[in-house]
């Protein structure tokens, strides 16, 4: 079945879906790696081990999602508490941590003139968002931006320092950090490599809970092994949403026993604690074009093959 997955990735590279990909699969206690296609077509650089990628929204689980799960498991926060208990500046006394972690609020993520706002103005705008007619699943970066600000209030530190102390240092993830970074796979042709692709995260830099982390296959292997083995992750393979329209774990998408998170730049990670399997897919699919709807279909083909693998 692994060969079917690799064949599909090769087909997608040949079809121009993305120039190259780094892929790793964990099964029977062993990681297998594949490095396919080109990392930087402009200079003919081949995909290889140790490349640094813009994780985009995979940052949500590597950072904020993991720290909040730690706090919850340690009894330091309650999921049904209001966000205002930890972040008094917000307008949302009725919105809980559980709703934010499962993207189940009624917040309207639209921010007028977003690209003209300063960092402080953008942060303030997220404290006073409009509301939709009713609660429903809506995947949005604002949920994890708010949770990042919550953590900064809770720890009285910048988010980058929190992630360093709570996750990256204890787990030995030395190749993971907020951008901009000096060395990375370029996400868009002609643009400087190492600059954060996501506009809000680019502006908020070390305060962004939604995106902005760069990492490697090596570090994500460490990360996923902790989710497969550590006590804190036990019990996450269940639905935490109180809505009927989408099952979600805390921070993670949930499909059966598989938990996953995807990123806009062409990234995803997956893990299955019951089967003790995991997968890492890193690409720069935004390099030549940005066809998001088609990318979701193509990405899902690879993810479905992983879920079906023996």
What are these regions (language model features)?
Residues 5, 79, 96-97, 159, ...:
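Hydrophobic side chains within well-formed alpha-helices
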Residues 6-10, 23, 29, 51-79, ...:
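Active-site SXXK
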Residues 9-46, 102-105, 114-115, 252, ...:
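A short, well-structured edge-of-sheet supersecondary motif
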Residues 33, 93-262:
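Short, surface-exposed loop or secondary-structure junction motifs
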Residues 245, 289-310:
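Short, gly/Ser/Thr-rich active-site loops of penicillin-recognizing serine hydrolases
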């Amino acid at each position: 079945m692994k060969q079917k997955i690799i064949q599909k990735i090769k087909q997608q590279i040949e079809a121009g879906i993305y120039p190259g990909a780094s892929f790793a699969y964990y099964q029977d206690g062993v990681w297998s790696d594949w490095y396919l296609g080109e990392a930087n077509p402009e200079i003919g650089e081949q995909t290889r081990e140790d490349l640094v990628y813009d994780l985009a929204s995979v940052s949500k689980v590597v950072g904020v999602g993991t720290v909040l799960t730690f706090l919850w498991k340690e009894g330091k926060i309650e999921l049904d508490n209001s966000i205002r208990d930890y972040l008094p500046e917000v307008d949302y006394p009725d919105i809980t941590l559980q709703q934010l972690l499962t993207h189940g609020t009624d917040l309207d993520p639209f921010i007028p003139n977003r690209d003209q706002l300063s960092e402080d103005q953008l942060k303030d705008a997220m404290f006073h968002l409009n509301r939709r007619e009713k609660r429903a699943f809506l995947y949005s970066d604002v949920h994890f931006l708010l949770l990042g600000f919550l953590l900064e209030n809770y720890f009285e530190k910048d988010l980058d320092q929190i992630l360093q102390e709570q996750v990256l240092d204890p787990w030995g993830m030395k190749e993971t950090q907020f951008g901009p970074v000096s060395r990375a796979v370029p996400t868009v042709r002609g643009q400087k490599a190492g600059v954060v692709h996501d506009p809000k995260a680019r502006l908020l830099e070390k305060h962004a809970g939604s995106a902005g982390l760069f990492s490697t296959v090596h570090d994500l292997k460490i990360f996923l092994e902790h989710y497969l083995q550590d006590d804190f992750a036990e019990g996450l393979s269940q639905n935490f949403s109180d809505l009927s329209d989408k099952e979600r774990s805390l921070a993670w998408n949930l499909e059966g026993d598989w938990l996953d998170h995807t990123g806009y730049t062409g990234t995803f990670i997956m893990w299955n604690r019951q089967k003790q399997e995991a997968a890492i897919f890193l690409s720069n699919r935004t390099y030549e074009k940005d066809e998001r709807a088609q990318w979701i279909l193509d990405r899902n083909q690879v993810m479905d093959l992983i879920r079906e693998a023996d």
